[in-house]
């Protein structure tokens, strides 16, 4: 009997050929009148497609189907994918049969949890395995829940709350898919109190490149269990569900205020100082946002937010560290305080499909003498960029780490950036894409990043895999995303997927 490794290696040539052909057609076209379809350069007969469809208990969507127009879309409108075939599996068997079909026909497969990849990685011209139908959230007892990879965060938060008043540290955008955020790490507004999303995962079910389904846990394939907690999605197999240990629901108190953009430098220095000194308790995650261009208030303002599970009086006292006598006075008449129903109730979140480019940086600490210089450099050059017009805008977001995130050692999960103090996200949005708008957007975000990243990387470099960046070179992104953990990720990849069937733009390489 041929083993898994032999089977994968014997089919590697077909996949390589399919990958070479996948760029032939940017948009899948149907051959006229000959009973065949062109799938990413591979000609497949109607009979073959029909037989495949009959074997899938879920849904198969082809370009000729009415559902295709919406099903093909991803969140980032910078990408306009036209996959050859979209499969929404309903079972492990559906996934295994889809893998088999893609292999035999030389079609590249990508996995989509929620479609929020910053670089459009869940689109393409081949097969999209859309996990949105595998979205159940089921209580297992004692605060344990089984969460389907395709469950959107709005459902996750709602179902956990309704089944015993539980929650989980997770993201703020309610349309993100759980499978993607959990495998990349999982930032959120409860992270300092309860850790990353992946820190609550106790086991997962994964369909491998040979079609077999395995458990990943401390007692069953511990290396795979380690890898899917921070290694990113789409590298090792198709995660069907995760068993997670929830935490008791706590009210999330949100306190938002504004500072004039003229004090942006002092505002960021204050956040860095409070974070480095440990004065921000782990019950609080703080954010600082600079919006410029069309999204900015007039006059432009910095947005500061505290996300707190502390008591109302404690939250007020923490806020005074920022705006009190030893802080910076807030802009009068702006800002508000409220209790959020869930961490997905984000006052700054853009939930509709958007055109944007994004970048990230993990800040391990800035030398005090350098902090002001770094801030002034990009403040002066970028927060008043004349190229940002009425149709586009930029945003720089700082979020505090530490707390429970840092309780786990960098090598204990694949998420390596445990000792980072701050996570920085750079976003350039377009309301209406145009060649001029794209140029302006790229000029701003790439220039801003060039100003900032080389300086902060002196104190510890890194980027976040779930904020993937297609400007990074093949020689750069593995080290920036995973650092010293990358060799172990590669070893796990070579063992489970030696032919690199699950190959994406920035997936772990063999």
Label for each model-derived stretch:
Residues 2-510:
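Soluble FAD-dependent oxygen oxidases
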């Amino acid at each position: 009997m041929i083993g898994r490794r032999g089977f994968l290696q014997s089919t590697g040539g077909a996949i390589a050929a399919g990958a070479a052909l996948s760029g032939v057609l940017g948009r899948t076209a149907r051959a006229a009148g000959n009973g065949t379809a062109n799938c990413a350069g591979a000609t497949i007969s109607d009979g073959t497609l029909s037989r495949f469809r009959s074997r899938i208990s879920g849904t198969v969507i082809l370009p000729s189907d009415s559902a295709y127009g919406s099903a093909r879309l991803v969140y980032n409108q910078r990408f306009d994918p036209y996959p050859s075939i979209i499969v929404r599996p309903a079972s492990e068997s559906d996934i295994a049969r889809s893998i088999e079909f893609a292999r035999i026909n030389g079609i590249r497969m990508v996995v989509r949890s929620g479609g929020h990849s910053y670089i459009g990685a869940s689109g393409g011209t081949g097969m999209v395995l859309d996990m949105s139908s595998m979205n159940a959230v089921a209580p297992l007892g004692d605060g344990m829940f089984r969460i389907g990879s395709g469950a959107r965060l709005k459902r996750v938060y709602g179902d956990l709350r309704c089944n015993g008043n539980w929650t989980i540290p997770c993201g703020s955008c309610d349309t993100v898919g759980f499978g993607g955020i959990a495998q990349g790490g999982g930032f959120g507004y409860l992270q300092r109190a309860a850790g990353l999303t992946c820190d609550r995962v106790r086991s997962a079910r994964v369909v491998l490149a040979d079609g077999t389904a395995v458990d990943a846990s401390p007692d069953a394939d511990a290396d795979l269990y380690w890898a899917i907690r921070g290694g990113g999605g789409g590298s090792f197999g198709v995660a069907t569900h995760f068993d997670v240990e929830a935490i008791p629901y706590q009210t999330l108190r949100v306190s938002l205020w504004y500072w004039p953009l003229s004090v942006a430098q002092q505002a960021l220095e204050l956040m860095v100082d409070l974070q480095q000194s440990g004065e921000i308790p782990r019950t609080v995650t703080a954010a600082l946002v600079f919006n410029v261009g069309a999204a900015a208030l007039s006059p432009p303002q910095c947005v500061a937010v505290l996300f707190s599970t502390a008591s109302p009086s404690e939250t007020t006292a923490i806020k005074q560290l920022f705006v009190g006598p030893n802080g910076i006075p807030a802009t009068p008449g702006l800002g508000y305080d409220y209790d959020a129903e869930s961490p997905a109730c984000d006052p700054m979140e853009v939930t509709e499909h958007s055109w944007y480019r994004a970048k990230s940086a993990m800040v391990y600490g800035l030398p005090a003498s350098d902090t002001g210089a770094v801030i002034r450099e990009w403040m002066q050059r970028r927060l008043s960029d004349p190229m940002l017009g009425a149709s586009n805008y930029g945003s720089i977001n700082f979020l505090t780490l530490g707390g429970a995130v840092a309780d786990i050692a960098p090598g204990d999960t694949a998420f390596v950036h445990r000792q980072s103090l701050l996570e920085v996200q750079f976003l350039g949005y377009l309301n209406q894409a145009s060649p001029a708008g794209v140029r302006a957007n790229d000029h701003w975000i790439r220039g801003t990043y060039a100003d900032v990243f080389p300086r902060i990387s002196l104190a510890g470099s890194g980027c976040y895999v779930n904020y993937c960046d297609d400007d990074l070179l093949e020689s750069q992104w593995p080290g920036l995303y995973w650092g010293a953990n990358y060799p172990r990720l590669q070893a796990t990849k070579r063992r489970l997927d030696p032919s690199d069937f699950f190959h994406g733009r920035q997936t772990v390489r063999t």
